[in-house]
Amino acid sequence: IAHTTFFDVQPDPTLKNAQDGAKQMAAFQPDTIIALGGGSAMDAGKIMWVLYEHPEANFMDMAMRFMDIRKRVYTFPTMGEKAYFIAIPTSAGTGSEVTPFAVITDGETGVKYPLADYQLLPNMAIIDADYHMSAPKGLTAASGIDAVSHAVEAYASIMATDYTDGLGLEALKNIFKYLPRAYENGQNDVEAREKMANAATMAGMAFANAFLGVCHSMAHKLGAFHHLPHGVANALLLEEVIRFNSSEVPTKMGTFSQYDHPHTMARYAEIADYLKLGGKTDEEKVENLIKAINELKDKVGIKKTIKDYGIDEKDFLDRLDAMTEQAFDDQCTGANPRYPLMSEIKQMYLNAYYGRHFVETEKPSAAQLKKTEKKSNKKA
């Protein structure tokens, strides 16, 4: 079998990175593309696939935001006309092997774009724990917590269904049970690696259909601005987002008709019930869920704050406004059950940096709400 290998994929792949891979594909003319690696390799592989099959495709058109992936203004090019795409993950977290998403960074602007279209769904995914056995502890931890955030956000999404709920809950049960084992003895514990591989893929199937939320919007930009691993960025922000979304009287709700009243606290409480975390009221159950997530992070060596990762305070504050605006504009924000104001995103970033908890501030004025809504409509 004639083959060639492109192995220069960066941890946060850039558009230039994908273009280089597409050039190699154009020279070789493959009829099968195999993306073997973690989320970066699979995401970059998807973009290479697009540029190989459709070199005329415009990146900014593909990155255009939309309200519903099935009813978008831009028609994504039809994939599979030249090559069959196979994804083989070597880490348990991203779920990219079963999702219609690819995250890529514009190297010129530094903006990280989550591209989304069902044409990006791989033709085949091969889940084999043998490829995971040598993953180092840091990667195992970051990837595992990333999968937690996928399952939690999919369950809280305004587009969640019975199908995505089952996948998300079962993924979480297995992650809480097997991630510490995979972290501590991953080179020898085949069962833990296999269960984590399956859990990450199930979480991927959940958010492939229910989508994500503002935790990922913020994590995309935190990672792009300060070069934190994606899973770590999600881990640092997830508690803040759970508290933010749990408000019974949000400043602004999500935008889909099926989400007709605030009930995200009850949804998080259902996760706590499934994991048998205890609690008599929804408030207690949410606190127990947050506690369990924090204990899991401690077990796998995730630090508590953004500051703990050596991010300079002045640099963080200097870039906070730009990071906040880009997070607000991120594609993932639209499926969040509570539509955030930019001031609220900024506060969550600050809390995650200093290790504080999100609390409701004074209700914004009508003028502030109108300004945020106007900006949201303009960007959409």
Predicted regions located by residue number:
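Carboxylate- and glycine-rich phosphate/diphosphate-binding segment that chelates Mg2+/Mn2+
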Residues: 98-210
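Glycine/threonine-rich beta-strand-loop-alpha-helix active-site module
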Residues: 16-23, 27-130
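Glycine-rich phosphate/pyrophosphate-binding beta-alpha loops
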Residues: 93, 201-234, 329-335
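Short, amphipathic C-terminal "tail helix"
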Residues: 315-380
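Flexible, glycine/charged-enriched surface loops at secondary-structure junctions
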Residues: 159-167, 183-195, 210-215, 253, ...
